[in-house]
Amino acid sequence: MQHPREENSIVVELEPSLATFIKQGFNNLVKWPLLNIGIVLSNTSTAVNEEWLTAVEHIPTMKIFYKHIHKILTREMGFLVYLKRSQSERDNYITLYDFDYYIIDKDTNSVTMVDKPTELKETLLHVFQEYRLKSSQTIELIAFSSGTVINEDIVSKLTFLDVEVFNREYNNVKTIIDPDFVFRSPFIVISPMGKLTFFVEVYSWFDFKSCFKDIIDFLEGALIANIHNHMIKVGNCDETVSSYNPESGMLFVNDLMTMNIVNFFGCNSRLESYHRFDMTKVDVELFIKALSDACKKILSASNRL
């Protein structure tokens, strides 16, 4: 019998500075948005609004929006969840299956419901207190992924709720919603001594390998773009940016990308320190090829799960 959820690890042995570069890139670039734009529309439960919003913010949405991973990571798409639930004598709890899940196209603000796996019925979110016929508890709320712009156009697409109530409650809380992009990394990644390890969760209802490939492809593209955009100051070294003096051969390392790339070519650098190093040894295209080969190796390892 296949379990709905399994914990696994994907391990590849790489040159240590390259492994560190990929780990740091993953942690800094692969940002899965949280549901931090939450609005409670109605609540007669014993849990206060803040408790509901905190619980909903951290719903593991990647296992629901798995068909849209790449566009969510590039922020071409966002998503929202909606819950409207009343306590009954027979149903005295709420699971993740009780929510409706929608993908948001950020170009058009179109809102499209996605299918939800029946396995979500096994994930408990809230238990109501003892049922009483004359005081049944209800909850209605909506939460958007971080970075979603709430405007008249997108609100007009929320045909499943009372727009007047939404506008009133949103106006009450919008000043306390964090304007920054709030996110989590999809996986824990470590790289001790070049042993790059992804700790992942595999679910039975979707093709994890395909989703993992979407993530690694996004990461590789973002890292290569960052490499091409990276600059090292040439001339007298100062301690505000990474800089190199060709006459003295002194390199000042002030960022992680410089540190990892020069270490790949034989330097033993640390952040915020000076090193004597011949920068002509650095071949950016060779480093990019090594990065692409490493990503292929990671995907090959994931296929063995």
Curated annotation (Swiss-Prot):
Which EC number(s) does UniProt give? 2.7.7.6
Q: Where in the cell is it found?
A: Virion
Q: Where on the tree of life does the source sit, at the highest rank?
A: Viruses
> What S-S linkages are listed for this chain?
none
One cellular component (GO) term of this entry: DNA-directed RNA polymerase complex
Just give the chief location class.
Answer: virion
Query: From its record, what is one biological process in GO terms?
Result: viral transcription
**Pfam families assigned to the protein according to its UniProt record, in alphabetical order:** Pox_RNA_pol_35
Q: Which InterPro entries match?
A: DNA-dir_RNA_pol_35kDa_poxviral
Q: What reaction does this enzyme carry out catalytically?
A: RNA(n) + a ribonucleoside 5'-triphosphate = RNA(n+1) + diphosphate
Keywords for this protein: DNA-directed RNA polymerase, Nucleotidyltransferase, Transcription, Transferase, Virion
Which Gene Ontology terms cover its molecular function? DNA binding; DNA-directed RNA polymerase activity
Q: What binding partners and quaternary form does the record give?
A: The DNA-dependent RNA polymerase used for intermediate and late genes expression consists of eight subunits 147 kDa, 133 kDa, 35 kDa, 30 kDa, 22 kDa, 19 kDa, 18 kDa and 7 kDa totalling more than 500 kDa in mass. The same holoenzyme, with the addition of the transcription-specificity factor RAP94, is used for early gene expression.
Q: Which family does it belong to?
A: Belongs to the poxviridae DNA-directed RNA polymerase 35 kDa subunit family.
Q: What does this protein do?
A: Part of the DNA-dependent RNA polymerase which catalyzes the transcription of viral DNA into RNA using the four ribonucleoside triphosphates as substrates. Responsible for the transcription of early, intermediate and late genes. DNA-dependent RNA polymerase associates with the early transcription factor (ETF), itself composed of D6 and A7, thereby allowing the early genes transcription. Late transcription, and probably also intermediate transcription, require newly synthesized RNA polymerase.
Stated name of the protein:
DNA-directed RNA polymerase 35 kDa subunit
Species the sequence originates in = Vaccinia virus (strain Ankara) (VACV)
